């Protein structure tokens, strides 16, 4: 019985502390115009930081000249 309680606590702990998947809405930024990346490509413009501390990169196509 005690082993089951410990196993349940361990599973719940892992579920609570597991980060969400990196796909979907989490990799968008700048009002869904930007892309979260570790480092912006040279052709893109750095806009700020994403929730996961990656750089928010705007394609030069989305910016006004």
Swiss-Prot record:
Task: Please name every pair of cysteines joined by a disulfide bond in this record.
Answer: 29-56, 36-50, 40-57
Keywords recorded for this protein, A-Z: Antibiotic, Antimicrobial, Defensin, Disulfide bond, Secreted, Signal
GO CC annotations?
extracellular region
The processes (GO biological process) annotated in the record are:
defense response to bacterium; innate immune response
Major subcellular site: secreted
> Where does the signal peptide begin and end?
1-23
InterPro entries from the UniProt entry? Beta-defensin, Beta_defensin_dom
The highest taxon in the source lineage is Eukaryota
Q: State the compartments where it is located.
A: Secreted
Function of the molecule: Has antimicrobial activity.
Tell me the protein family, please: Belongs to the beta-defensin family.
Q: What is the protein's name according to its record?
A: Defensin-B2
Q: What is the originating organism of this protein?
A: Ornithorhynchus anatinus (Duckbill platypus)
